[in-house]
UniProtKB/Swiss-Prot annotation, chain B:
Pfam families: Na_K-ATPase. The lineage of its organism: Eukaryota, Metazoa, Chordata, Craniata, Vertebrata. The sodium/potassium-transporting ATPase is composed of a catalytic alpha subunit, an auxiliary non-catalytic beta subunit and an additional regulatory subunit. Interacts with catalytic alpha subunit ATP12A. GO terms for biological process: intracellular potassium ion homeostasis; intracellular sodium ion homeostasis; potassium ion import across plasma membrane; sodium ion export across plasma membrane. GO terms for molecular function: ATPase activator activity. Glycans are attached at N124, N240. It is a single-pass type II membrane protein. The chain crosses the membrane at residues 36-56. Residues 57-279 are extracellular. This is Sodium/potassium-transporting ATPase subunit beta-3. Belongs to the X(+)/potassium ATPases subunit beta family.
Amino acid sequence: MRQRKLEIYSVEHHAATDIKKKEGRDGKKDNDLELKRNQQKEELKKELDLDDHKLSNKELETKYGTDIIRGLSSTRAAELLAQNGPNALTPPKQTPEIIKFLKQMVGGFSILLWVGAVLCWIAFGIQYVSNPSASLDSVYLGTVLAVVVILTGIFAYYQEAKSTNIMASFCKMIPQQAVVIRDSEKKVIPAEQLVVGDIVEIKGGDQIPADIRLLSAQGCKVDNSSLTGESEPQSRSSEFTHENPLETKNITFYSTTCLEASTSPVGTATGMVINTGDRTIIGRIASLASGVGNEKTPIAIEIEHFVHIVAGVAVSVGILFFIIAVCMKYHVLDAIIFLIAIIVANVPEGLLATVTVALSLTAKRMAKKNCLVKNLEAVETLGSTSIICSDKTGTLTQNRMTVAHLWFDNQIFVADTSEDNLNQGFDQSSGTWTSLSKIIALCNRAEFKPGQESVPIMKRVVVGDASETALLKFSEVILGDVMEIRKRNHKVVEIPFNSTNKFQLSIHQTEDPNDKRFLLVMKGAPERILEKCSTIMINGKEQPLDKSMAQAFHTAYMELGGLGERVLGFCHFYLPADEFPETYSFDSESMNFPTSNLCFVGLLSMIDPPRSTVPDAVTKCRSAGIKVIMVTGDHPITAKAIAKSVGIISANSETVEDIAKRCNIAVEQVNKRDAKAAVVTGMELKDMSPEQLDELLANYPEIVFARTSPQQKLIIVEGCQRQDAVVAVTGDGVNDSPALKKADIGVAMGITGSDAAKNAADMILLDDNFSSIVTGVEEGRLIFDNLKKTIAYTLTKNIAELCPFLIYIILGLPLPIGTITLLFIDLGTDIIPSIALAYEKAESDIMNRKPRHKKKDRLVNQQLAVYSYLHIGLMQALGAFLVYFTVYAQQGFRPTSLFHLRIAWDSDHLNDLEDNYGQEWTSYQRQYLEWTGYTAFFVGIMVQQIADLIIRKTRKNSIFKQGLFRNKVIWVGIASQIIVALLLSYGLGSITALNFTMLKAQYWFVAVPHAILIWVYDEMRKLFIRLYPGSWWDKNMYY
Amino acid sequence: MTKKEKKSFNQSLAEWKRFIYNPTSGEFLGRTAKSWGLILLFYLVFYGFLAALFTFTMWVMLQTLNDEVPKYRDQIPSPGLMVFPKPLSALEYTFSASDPSSYRGYIEDLRKFLKPYTLEEQKNLTVCPDGILSEQKGPVYVACQFPIFLLQACSGMSDPDFGYSQGSPCVLVKMNRIIGLKPEGTPRIECIPKDENVASISTYPNNGIIDLKYFPYYGKKLHVGYLQPLVAAQVIFSANSTKKEVTVECKIDGSPNLKNQDDRDKFLGRVAFKIIARA
């Protein structure tokens, strides 16, 4: 297995080494998976021996049993289609809906509640056997518990499904057509039906429908950026140029785009399909992505942690009191019922549904800001992100070449590279510029597609390669209608760019009717252009090109090249009218015109510029403590230049190489600690051990990875995850998809993103705007804080719900609150308020603090649990007991008489129980009083939960600073609490099964002083936390 | 995989040990002695304060109460009926006339219960006029005599076995005390056997009359020596019936404001009990 090579995934020739390493590591991790992978890899390996690029056309014909001229026969094609399946990527495996649903049914607390329900039924069963007239209470309770689980499960499932549906509609692919030769006829068929051996024709602008070995092509260029991250178009022809199938010119890949095929007249490139569907390179990368395990989201881990804590408390308290109850000679059945009640009291039944709602609210808010979240839990992940690994092309950059700098009159000018490009503020008064602009406009074969007059220039569709497009748009912006200029300066002859000449030339009649000279314009590789020149234009005047001018040219050329920009040189020459009269017949083949001693005019450099919002977003990420790492398939120089311009490498930081250059010493001599930034290429990366990578990631705050393969992207992400970082990966290409999947949160670009990337991602930026990530981080952090508040709010009342049972068991008071009544708090009065906390605004600038530490800053920590349970919870319990005792005392049972009254109180046959005033009560009358007690206790908790809700608005700041009325939803929540309680007491008070009674008006206010006390106490807590940060109080009281 | 788990188990064991006592930092259960001291002190003070506060609020609440009369009596608008003696479980009296030990418990309970009703005990009580409510203004409230002979055969005076030895047991039926309850009309307790062929019921005082003079009740504290009016029901099995088992239903009758029918409360103004007389 160690020998297996997957070089196909790699841009570099030898990148297979790192794949081996990765396999080795993974292998140790998981034997089963390894076995599975082995098989998968074995299968891959067979097909990876791609040698079609080396074969001649004849050999290809025999290999694939086809005919280059006539194509496959329809019958053979149909056979192959049946054999190999359609030419489409298998969509990632979906979890069946029923499994998703069942997961919701048993996840979280559901298991605990199911156990409770089953125990209830068992208890009833036993009771029924011994006494057929046993009360149905435990059956009711069991049923209610089951219904609660099912309802919350359905609810959570519905929420999930809703957010998934948005995605489903989003990811639909547009069916693609392909021109294929079959039975000697040209046919247009859906690309899905292509089979190996089909002869297809490709035009400029087409998506390549499968992996194709080119048979004939002229000037064909493909955009491989989605596969390799290279933003420059790659030329393709039918020649075999490289051993590596990815590098050779005669193979084009599925899902890449053909930019241009052949010169005029519009012709086509032909090729033979050599791989289809999942067997294409893209297909294999995609399957690599689906092979990467999906990590649990941080919030899922947190919720699990929280569920464990609460379930642990519930079960241990339950069992403890079960034992106590048995020791106190309670009937075992009764003890089981207590156990169930304690579990029900401890489990916040409504909380998980609330969390789901809170997350989906945030998801909605983020969708409005163009962040579409596929997986609800991923909403929070961005908030805890500590490292963002960003792809360059299309994510940080605009993914289109744009003119960035000009050099003329021995001076460098900066062009506007922002998205709209309209603000070209450099000095345009010089005569040199006039000449240069003319060359730019004329020596250019790119054209706007017609009918786009109303479209902004930068958005118009252009036929032509990326550089020419950039130049066309540049001159259109500055000069106006370029097509018109070209018409006025009629082109008489042209020589298109080719790789041997490295220049492009055209000769035009001038627009000046008095000037009968022809104008020769030329552009190309700067050094080639300079060779052909003997003069240079400075301030509109020709001067001889002396040594100093040549030196100046070289300096400028190096400088622009050093910025990672592609530099072009421009020159022109007015052909003398006497030698070249108007009737002169130019011939591009024999070149019967001068191509030397021309006049050099200027240089122009282009780059795929960063999006204008990116630098700001990077700065924000920095101040939020998030490390931004660039990972790109592009060249290191370009990568570094972009990194510098967007601030991934900040202005004053240097790499080891920079320091070496500045100090004029060897790279080895530089103290590595001095360098803040590092640029690492894929070649260097593949020689690194995991430990070295860890060291690199830990020591440099600013890192750029260049020339990386998809596999290496994965390794980098894993390296970051080893640092305990929560890693976000942004990308748009297919090559990013494994890393997107591996990341804690994969962020794909919505507009430029490939389907593979979108499939692998957890989040999609609809506007492709990197700065939307910042929004995501902010929302994610906010929801984390707010979930803390929600959970704290919900947990608090658990103590108030639990105490009644404990006291009932130990001290024998008439039961203060029933199990079903509890459910009305958990699922009735408390639901809307706990959701309302999700609307709370941030307390302080959450973007100025460090991302939370995955293992230290938990959602539910000890302080939160202790403060909720033992402080506020206990105060609530006391308040609720006060209401309870008040009701009993005012009806005739003084508190002291209630202790150990339980057996008499609960006895059905005792119908003359005497109270403190000598009155006698029947069993039902007592029962009714008990329900009144339930209602009173319920109202007591409800009133104090209002105070709890208000105090939970902030964790540190005073409520008055946060603003009592800023979050209106809180007040909706409070209103809902009161209305639900009123409805239960006065509306449904007559329904026996619900155990509510109409409570006297004054009892609603008994707990109010306690509620006020809770508020005051919490304000005090916050005050001390603010006054003495870092103190004992702060450490123990801040959650 | 198993290897890994083992390792992590050992690790977690070590972690637990370190959690229980960490020798380097001197932490016990995650806190140093000083920290434990502080936290315990804090909770002592905090819980002390809460306890004091709760005691205070309870005290305030108790101040709202009246010693003589409960603040509200709305939950017991109408009295329940109950029988005496109280059988051990359910309302089933099982006895055998020929076996005194089977009913000794009942008789003793009845004697004890009727003790306050003996003539010596009541001699300080007032003789009230029959048929009218004895409403009083206080401050001293007097209780009316309930002469035990009203219970005739069930008074225990003529038959110390309350009929049990003859196979015709006496069961006392009483109406729950409710402060301030003023029955209207002429309340009486009517007892009917489920199966009239098996047994007949005699009620004492005659007709099961409950005299209005015992109402209203003014509460345990004010109404010292108050005697609850009683009605005795004697079950007389028919001589020709072989079955000696009967269910008796008693209910309040003759008073419009005393309910004797409630779907949920089976003891509101009525009571049902079963007599099983074994041979």
